[in-house]
Structures are given as C-alpha cells and as structure tokens.
A protein has these predicted regions:
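Conserved binding/recognition cores within well-folded domains
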Residues: 132-171
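CheY-like receiver
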Residues: 43-47, 51-136
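Two-component/phosphorelay signaling modules centered on CheY-like receiver
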Residues: 2-9, 13-38, 43
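Extreme N-terminus of proteins, especially the signal/transit-peptide cleavage junction
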Residues: 1-5, 145-148
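Short loop/turn motifs at secondary-structure junctions
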Residues: 3, 28-31, 49, 77, ...
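Residues at the N-termini of beta-strands
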Residues: 31, 52, 102, 167-170
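A general structural signal for stabilizing positions within well-ordered secondary structure
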Residues: 23-26, 44, 72, 94, ...
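Short, hydrophobic/aromatic-rich beta-strand segments within well-structured domains
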Residues: 8, 82, 169-171
Length: 171
C-alpha cells in the first residue's frame, strides 16, 4: 500500500488556500487542514502532525509565516515549504534562517509544487535517519557501560555499521 503524504496549509487568502488544496488533492496528497494565522496553524499542526507544511510568509495575526516555520522546525521537526509572492533579499534572508525544505514563488505550477514536496519529504526522511544515527553514536560515547567496549563501527557504503565484536570473535 502506498503511503499518502499529509499536508497542512497556512495561507491567509481563502481563494489561494482552496486553489492550493485542490492542486494537492489532484496530485494525490491528503490535506489535513488550512489556517490563515500563526496561532491556529501551530495548534493544528501540533494536533494533526502533518508530514509537511506549506507556509505563506505573510499571514494574518502577529506571527509571520517565518515565525511559525521557525517554531515548527525547533519544536516539532516538521518540514516547511514556503509558498510566497515575496523574493526580496530581506525576506529571503529571514526565511533561510528557518532552513525551509523549499521556497516556491506564487503563482506556481502544479509540477513545481509536486516536485518540491517530494524532494522535501525525501530530504527530511534522510535528515531524520542521519540524526538518529548521530544520536546513537553520541549515546555510545556517553555510555560508560561495559557493553560499549565490544562494539566496532565499520564504514560501509558511506554509512557507519555497528558490529558487535562478540559476534565475530569467539573466546
């Protein structure tokens, strides 16, 4: 069975939000919801746990899309793609600090939306795998347990592979 990607949209213009929703459904994505402001977006994203968030930069309320994206990245590890009409240097400088998984200028083509989402989902998956591996390695370094001394790491295909020496050498 194919996994369906769950998407959350943060867009303050309802017509644009509906257009994005229709495009996503046509492309085979599941839209969990739409918010037009930062506070609602954060609450719903926490509750619904989407795979990815499409974020307008200029939204209603005191929080910008950049503020919301920064919070989502720091606290919830959900990838964000900006969908915006703004490409000035100031906006780009602020947006890139949040390390978005994409930046699409409006108006956009469905193929651009689709390819950016697919690349972002793949990159986020790989980033998560690398982080888990890194966390595991740090836990071994911090581990004062005797079992850690019997573990060897071998580089294989640009990845570290854990080998338990007790499985290789027999006493």
């Amino acid at each position: 069975m194919e996994n369906i990607t769950n998407v959350y949209i943060v867009e303050d213009e309802s017509i644009v939000a509906k257009d994005i929703q229709n495009s996503l459904k046509k492309l085979g994505y599941n839209v969990l919801g739409i918010s037009n402001n930062g506070a609602d977006a954060i609450k719903n994203i926490v509750d619904l746990e989407p795979h990815i968030v499409l974020m307008d930069i200029m939204i209603k309320g005191p929080l910008t899309g950049i503020d919301v994206a920064e919070k989502i990245k720091k606290e919830y590890n959900i990838p964000v793609i900006f969908l915006t009409a703004y490409a000035d240097e100031s906006t780009l400088s602020k947006a890139k600090i949040t390390e978005p998984y994409g930046y699409i200028l409006k108006p956009f083509k469905e193929i651009d939306l689709h390819s950016t989402i697919e690349m972002a989902i793949y990159k986020h998956k790989k980033d998560t795998e690398i982080q888990k591996e890194r966390d595991f390695l740090y836990s071994l370094v911090d581990n004062k347990d005797e079992t850690a001394k019997d573990i060897l790491f071998v580089k294989s295909n640009s990845r570290l592979v854990k080998v338990n020496l007790k499985d290789i050498f027999f006493d």
